[in-house]
A protein has these predicted regions:
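N-terminal compositionally biased, intrinsically disordered segments and leader/signal-like regions
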Residues: 7, 21-24, 111
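Extracytoplasmic metal-acquisition and chelation regions
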Residues: 12, 27-221
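Low-complexity intrinsically disordered segments
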Residues: 2-3, 17, 141
Length: 221
């Protein structure tokens, strides 16, 4: 039951990100060039930029950020960006080399280091450890890929799954874009406030649904 409940709650956050991206109005004329690595972050930034412009997504389709290789066109887009937003060079290894060689004009936002982002430890030991050892052979490949989702200090890289972290992601992105384009600062502030209100509502909903099982251990995989 715990696993099913957690899957349902995580699906709420995923649904929020999808709905956030849909039907976003665009501003006529030239807009800030904002490039984002992965879909969950892109969805949040797209809503933040509603009425201003549309951020460009790098890892599209079913591609994995762990194995993604930059094409000349995507490398060029990052080099020509005003703001480049990523989670971390561990979650997105393809960003390591290009970030070190970007022009100084490109503002790089590494979200795992953003103010207000809470990092959660990689799950291990106890119930989770027993679960892993019981499925070692069947899930060896899956666990190997999962390991790439964690930073070197053992922290989980899926920072956007926590609504509080999602607010911090939006705040860091808004700050970077507004610094480059102060003429959009007020619109960004308005959009950020609207996103925060929705995320607060989602956080309350999740807390309410989790209340009956808050003291029970459960596994997410």
């Amino acid at each position: 039951m715990g696993d099913l409940m957690t899957r349902a709650l995580l699906s709420k956050m995923s649904a929020f990100l999808v709905l956030t991206f849909m039907s976003l109005p665009l501003r006529a004329g030239e807009a800030p060039k904002v490039v984002v690595t992965i879909k969950p972050i892109h969805s949040l930034v797209a809503r933040l930029m509603a009425g201003i412009g549309q951020p460009q997504l790098i890892v599209d389709g079913s591609a994995s950020p762990h194995t993604f290789t930059l094409k000349p066109s995507t490398a060029r887009a990052i080099n020509e960006a005003d703001v480049f937003i990523r989670v971390s060079d561990t979650l997105e290894p393809f960003t390591r080399k290009i970030v070190s060689s970007l022009p100084s004009a490109v503002t790089v936002v590494t979200l795992i280091d953003a103010q207000g982002v809470k990092l959660f430890d990689q799950r291990h030991g106890g119930t989770f450890e027993k679960h892993v050892h019981g499925h070692e052979e069947a899930n060896a490949e899956g666990h190997a890929e999962e390991a790439e989702d964690h930073d070197e200090d053992g922290k989980d890289g899926h920072i956007w799954l926590d609504p509080v972290n999602a607010k911090a992601i939006v705040a860091a992105s808004a700050k970077a874009i507004a610094k480059r384009y102060p003429e959009y600062a007020e619109k960004l502030r308005q959009n950020e406030a609207a996103i925060d209100a929705d995320l607060d509502a989602l956080d309350r909903e999740i807390a309410t649904e989790l209340k009956p099982v808050r003291d029970k251990p459960f596994i997410v995989f």
